[in-house]
UniProtKB/Swiss-Prot annotation:
Keywords, alphabetical: ATP-binding, Kinase, Membrane, Mitochondrion, Mitochondrion inner membrane, Nucleotide-binding, Phosphoprotein, Transferase, Transit peptide
Residue positions where Phosphoserine is found in the record: S151, S196, S232, S365
Subcellular localization(s) per the UniProt record: Mitochondrion inner membrane
Sites where the protein binds ATP: 161-165, 224, 269, 325, 353-358, 368
Xref: PROSITE patterns: PHOSPHAGEN_KINASE, PHOSPHAGEN_KINASE_C, PHOSPHAGEN_KINASE_N
GO biological process, one term: negative regulation of apoptotic process
Organism in which the protein naturally occurs: Bos taurus
Taxonomy, superkingdom: Eukaryota
Lineage, uppermost ranks: Eukaryota, Metazoa, Chordata, Craniata, Vertebrata
Recorded name of the encoding gene: CKMT1
Region (Cardiolipin-binding), start-end ranges: 40-64
Protein name from the UniProt record: Creatine kinase U-type, mitochondrial
Additional facts recorded: Mitochondrial creatine kinase binds cardiolipin.
């Protein structure tokens, strides 16, 4: 059970718990009174904002599109209650201009309050990235009722594996770009303690990266079970690779079909996956496991970061809302060579990656296809969108195999 300091963390606004974790347990707690979220503190600087404004002229990311000198001047001296600044939010986007044809987000949050204190920049970035969702006027819905899914069984001549993942953050502890070693270890302690309560087909064990051999880590990475080593410039520039591999690890059930990553880009990534095309079964396990993990977290006096405007709070604005990415590894040797392929994906609100994850190339015409949106639609809606979209892609591939023409579908209606 969480101690009195831990429970105060999420129970009393305006109080901040600084947990000093040692040997995997809470060693001491100090209550630090902070100002309300919107009354962010100010800090002094030696030079005017105009002298500090970053050179974004060659950048192609959402942050650069919305960070004007005026916005920078209004926000650059603010800090969240934990001391997180605007410059820390945007550093990864400043250091990584982006690809001419691939627009990245270009910013991260350091804590839950980041999205309020720097809302003048985050809100328009969120609106652009999430297909017009306006966090100032809209509310996000959550739906984890897997029984609502229609169909969900793919032709396994094309679909090699199915997977659904999300992220969850522990309220009261800084997010990975900003967390201290003690906070990161506290995240690990809280999560692993909760996961020990999983039963039945969800029961499993936790494996610390620091206790694995290089060969064991690489095998898990190659099998698509474990996150890659922190070599991505987006990850390192944001500060998420500090102290690697301290307090990082993977928990999985005995069948390796339900997994939780700890302390990579987010506090946790919850994953349901299996070989083949049974997306409905994968999503059912995902919903059941995620609900049970949240119950066990709450039972111990903690809770996930969430609000009705943004849904579940995660490090990258692209993952707000559901945090959900439902995807398949799919063979599309003919469609992938068709010039209409990118437009088809765009209209279906799908995105493609290589099978090694973000920023990787496809191998053998096998792609990772998943939903583009996270916020403004429920989990059920997004998984159904992927099911319908992947079936459309399979139909296109079959038509091309028979020498028939394919069509570009009309854009999906934008319903938030």
């Amino acid at each position: 059970m969480a101690g009195p300091f831990s429970r105060l963390l999420s129970a009393r606004p305006g109080l901040r718990l600084l947990a000093l974790a040692g040997a995997g347990s809470l060693a001491a707690g100090f209550l630090l009174r902070s100002e309300p979220v919107r009354a962010a503190s100010e800090r002094r600087r030696l030079y005017p904002p105009s002298a500090e404004y970053p050179d974004l002229r060659k950048h192609n990311n959402c942050m650069a599109s919305h960070l004007t000198p005026a916005v920078y001047a209004r926000l650059c001296d603010k800090t969240t209650p934990t001391g997180w600044t605007l410059d820390q939010c945007i550093q990864t986007g400043v250091d990584n201009p982006g690809h001419p044809f691939i627009k990245t987000v270009g910013m991260v949050a350091g804590d839950e309050e980041t999205y309020e204190v720097f809302a003048e920049l985050f809100d328009p970035v969120i609106q652009e990235r999430h297909n017009g969702y306006d966090p100032r006027t809209m509310k996000h819905t959550t739906d984890l009722d897997a029984s609502k899914i229609r169909s969900g069984y793919f032709d396994e001549r094309y679909v090699l594996s199915s997977r659904v993942r999300t992220g969850r953050s522990i309220r009261g502890l800084s997010l990975p770009p900003a967390c201290t070693r003690a906070e990161r270890r506290e995240v690990e302690r809280v999560v692993v303690d909760a996961l020990s309560g999983l039963k039945g087909d969800l029961a499993g064990r936790y494996y610390r990266l620091s206790e694995m051999t290089e060969a064991e880590q690489q095998q898990l990475i190659d099998d698509h079970f474990l996150f890659d080593k922190p070599v991505s410039p987006l990850l390192t520039a944001a500060g998420m690779a500090r102290d690697w591999p301290d307090a990082r690890g993977i928990w999985h059930n005995n069948e390796k079909s339900f997994l939780i990553w700890v302390n990579e880009e987010d506090h946790t990534r919850v994953i349901s996956m299996e070989k083949g095309g049974n997306m409905k079964k994968v999503f059912e396990r995902f919903c059941r496991g995620l609900k049970e993990v949240e119950r066990l977290i709450q039972e111990r006096g903690w809770e996930f970061m969430w609000n009705e405007r943004l849904g579940y709070i995660l490090t990258c604005p692209s993952n707000l809302g559901t945090g959900l990415r439902a995807g398949v590894h799919i063979k599309l040797p003919l469609l992938s060579k068709d010039s209409r392929f990118p437009k088809i994906l765009e209209n279906l609100r799908l995105q493609k990656r290589g099978t090694g994850g973000v920023d990787t190339a496809a191998t053998g015409s096998v792609f990772d296809i998943s939903n583009l949106d996270r916020l403004g639609k429920s989990e059920v809606e997004l998984v159904q969108l992927v099911i319908d979209g992947v079936n459309f892609l399979i139909d296109c591939e079959r038509r091309l195999e028979r020498g028939q023409d394919i069509r570009i579908p009309p854009p999906l209606p934008n319903k938030h």
